[in-house]
Each structure stands twice: as structure tokens, then as C-alpha cells.
Amino acid sequence: MARLKEFYKKDVVTMMMKRFNYSSVMEVPRILKITLNMGVGEAVGDKKVMNHAIEDMTLISGQKPVVTKARKSIAGFKIREGWPIGCKVTLRRERMYEFLDRLISITLPRVRDFRGLNPKSFDGTGNYSMGIHEQIVFPEIDYDKTDGIRGLDICITTSAKTNEEAKALLEAFNLPLKDKDRK
């Protein structure tokens, strides 16, 4: 079993039940899924870029991504409906906890000038979104073999009803959120 999953079952559930006065263990919020999304606008001009993005995403997540296609044609961006413009991966269960563990303990400390994640990135219903500007901060990506620097979006979906519950859950997992007084 993943280290963070054991930690959640043993420590986080009891801490959250005390803090929010839940009557049942099933009321305690949990992380449902983590979605990684990489928009690859350069793939319009060069098809190899998409293949490199798929390789990077596979290395980062541990599973093959789904290629996202343009929903409609936009002349200003020079894209047509159905053209590949990105890729995404949805992580659940064991892989999700393993990815979160790597993200918190290895990847985020490697980000240049990192001072914590923005605590205002909650969406109001208990989900947290963040962006990574360079995919090379992940230890799985070899800097010498990469063709370019691309960013990706990470969305952590929880079963929490409010932002306060979701923030408490993610802080229990040691996700480094900034303090409100410190900017």
C-alpha cells in the first residue's frame, strides 16, 4: 500500500474527525483523483512535439495519457477541429497516492524560487488546481533528452464540500501552501 494512503487511514482520518466533528468515518473528505493536463499548442506546427509531450507525461504519471483534440476550429490559433492540441492523465487509487507523495517530497522542493503554493487556488467546492512551469523539475524527466520546456496543470479533486475542509486535508498531507500573511 502507498505510504500516503496508510498515513491517510491511520492519522488523517482521526485528525479530521476531531477537527470538523464528523459523526462517521465516511464523512471525512478524501482525495478522489489527480488530473494532469499538458496543453501543447506547438503541436499544430510540428507533430513530433506531441509525441515528446506524451513521452514526458507517461514518465511523470506512470500511465499513458489521452490525447486531447480541438473541439472547434479557431483561425487565430491556426487550429482545426479534431487536431491534437494536448494530453491528459487521470490518476486514481495507488498511482494517485504515489504521484502525490513524489510531488510533495521530491518535485515541489526542486522548483526554482519556490515559496509555497497559492492558497487561493481552491475552486469553492474543495478542489485544488496548480501549475508547474517546467516539466524538468520531475526527477523522471532527463534534462538532456528533452526537446523543450513545457508546463503542466495539476488538479487535485477531493470529496470535501468546502475549501476549508479541502485545505485541512491537503495540509495534513504536508502540501506546502503559503501563509496568508506572507506574500
Swiss-Prot record:
The UniProt entry's GO CC annotations, sorted and at most eight, read: ribonucleoprotein complex; ribosome
Q: Which UniProt keywords apply?
A: Ribonucleoprotein, Ribosomal protein, RNA-binding, rRNA-binding, tRNA-binding
Q: Which InterPro entries match?
A: Ribosomal_uL5 (IPR002132), Ribosomal_uL5_bac-type (IPR020930), Ribosomal_uL5_C (IPR031309), Ribosomal_uL5_CS (IPR020929), Ribosomal_uL5_dom_sf (IPR022803), Ribosomal_uL5_N (IPR031310)
Is rRNA-binding found in the keyword set? Answer: yes
Biological process (GO), any one: translation
What does the UniProt record say this protein does?
This is one of the proteins that bind and probably mediate the attachment of the 5S RNA into the large ribosomal subunit, where it forms part of the central protuberance. In the 70S ribosome it contacts protein S13 of the 30S subunit (bridge B1b), connecting the 2 subunits; this bridge is implicated in subunit movement. Contacts the P site tRNA; the 5S rRNA and some of its associated proteins might help stabilize positioning of ribosome-bound tRNAs.
What family classification does the UniProt entry report for this protein?
Answer: Belongs to the universal ribosomal protein uL5 family.
Can you say what this protein is called? Answer: Large ribosomal subunit protein uL5
Which organism is the protein's source? Answer: Legionella pneumophila (strain Corby)
Q: What is the lineage of its organism?
A: Bacteria, Pseudomonadati, Pseudomonadota, Gammaproteobacteria, Legionellales
* Encoding gene (name): rplE
